[in-house]
Amino acid sequence: MSRLEQRFAQLKTEGRAVLVTFITAGDPGYDTSLKVLKGLPAAGADVIELGMPFTDPMADGVAIQLATLRALDAGQTLLKTLQMVSEFRVDDQTTPIVLMGYYNPIHRFGVEAFVAQAKEAGVDGLIIVDLPPEHDAELATPAQASGIDFIRLTTPTTDDARLPRVLERSSGFVYYVSVAGVTGAGSATTEHVTEAIARLRRHTSLPISVGFGIRTPEQAAAIARLADGVVVGSAFVDKIATAESPEQAIDGVLTLCAALAEGVRNARVS
């Protein structure tokens, strides 16, 4: 059983959802980003998505685009992102880490080398937003063969004809993008999310995590009552963007994480 499977199974037995947190690797700089990464589990993050900076983040909204630019300007590379995971694993061997991003940097790095180094670093899963299931052989197949989960995105526009193909080789969990559009867009209604989760459950037994547009403990709690996981990203990135110092960035992210974690943990308490 993978680290991701263990974490979702464990928290299901505890009767609560999983808090999945997203930050961009190297934003606003390597050292600060690493401190945030290392601090997230103690602040309540159950799974961490680590964004791999890329020069053309087409699926991301302004907040994450700017985070990517800050990271790239600070010298962040794919190799440094893998190094960051390795440094995290020195002290934490239990919190799952999922790398999220685009295929181009991986292709340039070399798929075989990337998969090998990601596994060695302690990466648990991949979300590659621009690599459809028709191209599984390029990355999903070698990643899963090495024990790295390959997580697919589904959206409100993924119809019943397409859904089985998207989910066929998915592993780890399913990431439901609750709002069609770029990251950081407005949030979906609970009625919409309820219907979407029910539809997904007819097609898969994998845990379902819901993201895009969740910014507050109240919103996180509402989704945690419905889904197996709650994904928050842009709200953390905004804390880094508005911070006046590295210390303020770290504190802002971890304080928000603790508040969101409390919302998720108390969501199903009667």
Swiss-Prot record:
Q: Where is the active site?
A: E49 (proton acceptor), D60 (proton acceptor)
Pathway(s) it belongs to: Amino-acid biosynthesis; L-tryptophan biosynthesis; L-tryptophan from chorismate: step 5/5
* UniProt keyword annotation of Lyase present: yes
Coiled-coil ranges per the record?
none
Point out the signal peptide segment.
Answer: none
Q: Which PROSITE patterns match?
A: TRP_SYNTHASE_ALPHA
Q: GO molecular function terms here?
A: tryptophan synthase activity
Q: Which InterPro entries does this entry report, sorted A to Z?
A: Aldolase_TIM (IPR013785), RibuloseP-bd_barrel (IPR011060), Trp_synthase_alpha_AS (IPR018204), Trp_synthase_suA (IPR002028)
Known catalytic reactions: (1S,2R)-1-C-(indol-3-yl)glycerol 3-phosphate + L-serine = D-glyceraldehyde 3-phosphate + L-tryptophan + H2O
Q: What is its EC number?
A: 4.2.1.20
* A Gene Ontology cellular-component term: cytosol
Question: Which UniProt key words apply to this protein?
Answer: Amino-acid biosynthesis, Aromatic amino acid biosynthesis, Lyase, Tryptophan biosynthesis
Q: Which PANTHER family match?
A: TRYPTOPHAN SYNTHASE ALPHA CHAIN, CHLOROPLASTIC, TRYPTOPHAN SYNTHASE, ALPHA CHAIN
Could you say which protein family the record assigns here? Belongs to the TrpA family.
**What subunit structure does UniProt give?**
Tetramer of two alpha and two beta chains.
Biological role stated in the UniProt entry: The alpha subunit is responsible for the aldol cleavage of indoleglycerol phosphate to indole and glyceraldehyde 3-phosphate.
Q: What is this protein called?
A: Tryptophan synthase alpha chain
- Species of origin reads Pseudomonas syringae pv. tomato (strain ATCC BAA-871 / DC3000)
The taxonomic lineage of its organism, from the top, reads:
Bacteria, Pseudomonadati, Pseudomonadota, Gammaproteobacteria, Pseudomonadales
